[in-house]
């Protein structure tokens, strides 16, 4: 095969000449007809090919899938980056989840509406969750701790029930000051009554009885 060179002819006619040569210089660029030819010197830009630039960023107008996750480095330890990664299975337990949000220490939540401070913070090392707002739940809020420790700790139902049962047992073993009915014997060193007996079922006071073997003005009993 012959090389195509300047002045090459076919059938006695020049193949390329000034009138039909498709390459044209345009400043530092070379155009093929009206299209720019990219080279090592003139590399394509992100805007030329609808790319997102590594250096300048950009916007994806549609869904993007990252099979290996998204990694976000942070200042204190660049070797232990944070990020969002695919989980190890279909589940919602400590052993299995669909995605993992990974942080060296904490995950913070901020509002983009005029607020610079975090309103929710999650400690990924021990699972502590702190919030400046209200915690609302449509279902039950459950705790694995058996008993409260701090003054502001919430209490479990079994702990409250146990305390109520203790109070009830104590109440059932005592006589109320406002009045009560004994189901057993009542023993005391002395009973003091402010009012004299006035009903057949009342216990009489000392000043309402005649003492055995005592001498009375009206005779001997």
Curated annotation (Swiss-Prot):
It comes from the Viruses. Its main location: virion. GO terms for biological process: adhesion receptor-mediated virion attachment to host cell; symbiont entry into host cell. It is found in: Virion. One of its GO terms (cellular component) is virus tail, fiber. Keywords: Host-virus interaction, Late protein, Viral attachment to host adhesion receptor, Viral attachment to host cell, Viral tail fiber protein, Viral tail protein, Virion, Virus entry into host cell. Belongs to the tevenvirinae tail fiber protein p36 family. The long-tail fibers are trimeric, with a stoichiometry of gp34/gp37/gp36/gp35 of 3:3:3:1. Structural component of the distal-half of the long-tail fiber. The long-tail fiber of T4 is about 1600 Angstroms long with a kink in the middle that divides the fiber into proximal and distal halves. The thin tip of the distal half-fiber interacts with the bacterial lipopolysaccharide receptor and specifies the host range of the phage. This is Long-tail fiber protein gp36. It comes from Enterobacteria phage T4. The lineage of its organism: Viruses, Duplodnaviria, Heunggongvirae, Uroviricota, Caudoviricetes. The gene is 36.
């Amino acid at each position: 095969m012959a090389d195509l060179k300047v002045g090459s002819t076919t059938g006695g006619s020049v193949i390329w000449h000034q009138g039909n040569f498709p390459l044209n210089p345009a400043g530092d660029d070379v155009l093929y007809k009206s299209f720019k030819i990219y080279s090592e010197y003139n590399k394509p830009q992100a805007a030329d090919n609808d790319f997102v630039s590594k250096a300048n960023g950009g916007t994806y107008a549609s869904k993007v899938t990252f099979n290996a996750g998204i990694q976000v480095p942070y200042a204190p330890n660049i070797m232990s980056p944070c990020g969002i990664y695919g989980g190890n299975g279909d589940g919602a337990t400590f052993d299995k989840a669909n995605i993992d949000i990974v942080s060296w220490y904490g995950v913070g939540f901020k509002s983009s509406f005029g607020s610079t401070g975090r309103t929710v913070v999650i400690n990924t090392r021990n699972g502590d969750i702190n919030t400046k707002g209200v915690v609302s739940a449509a279902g039950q809020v459950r705790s694995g701790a058996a008993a409260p420790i701090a003054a502001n700790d919430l209490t479990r139902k079994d702990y409250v029930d146990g305390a109520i049962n203790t109070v009830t047992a104590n109440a059932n073993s005592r006589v109320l000051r406002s009045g009560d009915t004994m189901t057993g014997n009542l023993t005391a060193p002395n009973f003091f009554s402010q009012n004299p007996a006035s009903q057949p079922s009342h216990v009489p006071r000392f000043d309402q009885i005649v003492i055995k073997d005592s001498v009375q003005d009206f005779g001997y009993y």
